[in-house]
UniProtKB/Swiss-Prot annotation:
Annotated organism of origin: Clavibacter sepedonicus (Clavibacter michiganensis subsp. sepedonicus)
GO biological process, one term: menaquinone biosynthetic process
Bias (Low complexity) ranges: 1-18
Keywords, ordered alphabetically: Magnesium, Manganese, Menaquinone biosynthesis, Metal-binding, Thiamine pyrophosphate, Transferase
Name this protein carries in UniProt: 2-succinyl-5-enolpyruvyl-6-hydroxy-3-cyclohexene-1-carboxylate synthase
GO molecular function, one term: manganese ion binding
Manner of cofactor binding, per the entry note: Binds 1 thiamine pyrophosphate per subunit.
Organism classification: Bacteria, Bacillati, Actinomycetota, Actinomycetes, Micrococcales
E.C. code: 2.2.1.9
Length: 589
């Protein structure tokens, strides 16, 4: 959609009139009107980066924090701020406005905006800008900001303010409409706000204004369900596999249970649990009698972690149904999807109940056998404690050897899974480790997030911080939980600036666990590793790094633990720390 007509410009109305005291300064009064409108809509968190052109918004946000109107999160790096807002939106389901000044500050939001658009996360960008007369004439720190994020991100360019009631009411309505669109459509929305000198004055006390807008706040609407006409009825007939990709939610597990069908659920799907779960679906899709017998596949979410799923969806002999959408594009590998309903439901009964039970049972049984075999290969042999001195000595030696064993990737993800409870949050970076987790971890109802919209390593730590801040701010069980972020060393270094949490900022309970294998070993498993020269692979793909992570953590005010053995890892994951904790786990390449 075009930037100019992306959002409506509603006329003033009593239901969204400009509230709060006036200062006589158009910039400050605009900021008060817009941010109070957002508080009225239910905004609880605001992220901002310092800057001159956006100072009115920043100073009003600071006053709102002072009077407990919002929780304010200040960052000096706009890329980190964007992903922090993304994490807040992931956890809460509501956009957390992110405020920046003009120029490259806006451009640095782009990675988070792309991830938000592709993964269906609500975001609201409030970017300061020069007035029209200062654009296009090489003014300092001025570029073409409207439309910077492309024609897929809704954008409105708000002209510099005048001091009239109609203008302030319009500003409040624009803020309201932008917020609602981001929330309801689960997408980024960009409001580019021009300010003219003088850029701010002292902000008045907003205590009464916050109380008034909260008293008048509308109830948050319940998510609208799909129209009856867009619900597809599914008969039991064909041999069916349910696939839950990233952000599928619990609907995939519910459908698999209702239909009596096997469930192939990726680790960040939100459906990686339940009696129908098939963890080892990759192996079975390639095995005779399993993948070749699938007649229908029903996909929820965005599958990104396997090649087997898109191959299955693209087969001519398989009916492919993709339910809903988790981002700006519909999942349709090889353009073979036959239906794309908003929702589905199971109708009727199986024609052959015994055959239906066998179909599900063989998938679940074989998957568990594969998983048990892999677990046994990684685990220490089970020995009886013994009654004789020799038997007790052998048992003690075996126990000690298990504790002292080096950590492997599979053991790392299993130990992390075992330490994580339903009230905790787990964030997985884009590396070999998320694939290891996807292949090795049994079902468990744990909230797992990964930035799989574009599957980049950008902003993983900052996303995790946003999820931690949002989950621990509420009154539910998650408020007592901890957020663990599992990344590779390159993912950590790419987002290292996010470790900087400024003085006076909220510090959540968080552990960043770094699988440190000295570079990008994910490329060792790709085709390029079999065709390119090893020296070239190391130079331009593996990109070896040597960083003292203990010193790095200390520089940013994080605690640091090194966990090279099973025993050290178990102790580290259960360590209580006042400071955020970075756990370094050395891994072999």
């Amino acid at each position: 959609m075009a930037a100019a007509d992306a959002l409506p410009t509603s006329s003033a109305s009593a239901s969204a009139s400009a509230d709060g005291p006036r200062t006589g300064n158009p910039s400050t009064d605009r900021a008060i009107a817009m941010l109070l409108a957002l508080v009225r809509e239910g905004v609880t968190d605001v992220v901002l980066c310092p800057g001159s052109r956006s100072q009115a918004l920043a100073l009003v946000a600071a006053e709102l924090e002072r009077v407990d109107g919002v929780r304010l999160h200040v960052r000096i790096d706009e890329r980190a701020a964007g992903f922090l807002a993304l994490g807040l939106g992931v956890e809460s389901g509501r956009p957390a406005p992110v405020i920046t000044t003009s120029g490259t500050a806006v451009a640095n939001l782009h990675p988070a905006v792309l991830e938000g658009w592709h993964s269906g996360v609500p975001m609201l960008l409030l970017t300061g800008d020069r007035p029209a007369e200062l654009r296009g004439i090489a003014s300092n720190q001025t570029t073409r900001q409207p439309g910077m994020f492309g024609d897929r991100v809704a954008c409105i360019d708000v002209p510099a303010p005048e001091e009239t009631d109609d203008d302030l009411a319009r500003d409040a309505l624009l803020a309201r409409d932008a917020y609602r669109r981001a929330r309801d459509e689960r997408t980024p929305v960009h409001v580019n706000v021009a300010f003219r000198d003088p850029l701010s004055v002292a902000v008045p006390d907003l205590t009464e204004a916050v109380a008034e807008v909260r008293a008048a706040a509308p109830a948050t609407p319940a998510p609208a369900g799909p129209a009856t006409a867009d619900v597809l009825d599914l008969p039991h007939g064909p041999r069916t596999l349910v696939v839950a990709g990233h952000a599928a939610g619990e609907a995939a597990e519910e459908l698999a249970r209702a239909g009596g069908w096997p469930l192939a659920a990726e680790i960040s799907s939100g459906s990686h649990f339940g009696p129908n779960l098939v963890v080892s679906f990759r192996e079975l899709l390639a095995r005779e009698g399993f993948g070749d017998r699938v007649e229908r596949v029903i996909v929820f979410g965005h599958p990104t972690l396997t090649r087997e799923v898109p191959l299955l969806v693209g087969r001519e002999d398989v009916e492919a149904i993709v339910v809903g959408s988790t981002g700006g594009e519909d999942y349709d590998p090889r353009h073979r999807v036959t239906a794309h309903p908003a929702a589905v439901r199971v109708v009727g009964e199986p024609a052959d109940p015994a055959e239906a039970r066998r179909w599900l049972g063989t998938w679940v049984h074989e998957s568990r056998a594969i998983l048990d075999e892999a677990t046994a290969a990684e685990s220490a042999p089970l020995l009886p404690s013994g009654t004789t001195p020799a038997e007790r000595r052998d048992f003690a030696r075996a126990e000690l050897a298990a504790v002292r064993a080096d950590v492997t990737r599979r053991h790392l993800v299993r130990a992390l899974w075992q330490a994580t409870w339903p009230h905790d949050r787990l964030v997985l970076g884009a590396s070999r480790l998320i694939r290891e987790a996807d292949r090795a971890l049994p079902g468990k109802r744990v909230r797992v997030h990964a930035n799989r919209g574009l599957a980049g390593i950008d902003g993983t730590i900052s996303t995790g911080l946003g999820i931690a801040l949002a989950s621990q701010a509420g009154s539910g069980s998650a408020a007592a939980g901890i957020t663990r972020v599992l990344v590779g060393d390159l993912t950590l270094l790419h987002d290292v600036g996010s470790l900087l949490i400024g003085t006076g900022e909220r510090v959540p309970r968080i552990q960043v666990i770094v699988g440190n294998d000295g570079g990008g070993t994910i490329f060792d498993g790709l085709e390029v590793s079999r065709t390119a020269a090893p020296a070239s692979i190391d130079r331009v793909m593996f990109t070896p790094q040597r960083v003292d992570l203990a010193s790095l953590a200390r520089a940013y005010g994080w605690a640091h633990l090194r966990a090279a053995t099973h025993g050290e890892l178990e102790a580290a994951l259960t360590t209580a720390s006042e400071a955020p904790l970075l756990i370094e786990v050395p891994l072999a390449r």
